[in-house]
């Protein structure tokens, strides 16, 4: 089992993952960090739990829209 540190909005989180998954976890962490920083730029300071919930909602919305697009494609 491997461990990587991801940073989201200047806070570090240790994440355990399968060996070989480290690069993917770091990429996903950077995506979360970008979303979090974008939200804090737009909204100002919000508490960490709220921020992470909002990031999750944004990503869930993007995924939902992609699924709609894929399911309606010929």
Language model: regions and residue ranges:
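An acidic intrinsically disordered interaction segment
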Residues: 11-31
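N-terminal intrinsically disordered, cationic/polar leader segments
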Residues: 3-5, 74
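Long, hydrophobic or amphipathic alpha-helical segments
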Residues: 45, 49-52, 56-74
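Short small-residue beta-strand/loop micro-motif enriched in glycine and branched aliphatics
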Residues: 14-16, 37, 66-67
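Short amphipathic alpha-helical segments and their helix-coil junctions
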Residues: 29-42
């Amino acid at each position: 089992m491997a461990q990587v540190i991801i940073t989201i909005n200047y806070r570090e989180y240790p994440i355990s993952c399968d060996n070989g998954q480290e690069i993917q976890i770091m990429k996903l962490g950077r995506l979360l960090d970008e979303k979090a920083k974008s939200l804090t730029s737009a909204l100002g300071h919000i508490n960490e739990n709220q921020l992470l919930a909002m990031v999750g909602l944004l990503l869930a919305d993007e995924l939902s829209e992609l699924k709609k697009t894929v399911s309606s494609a010929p």
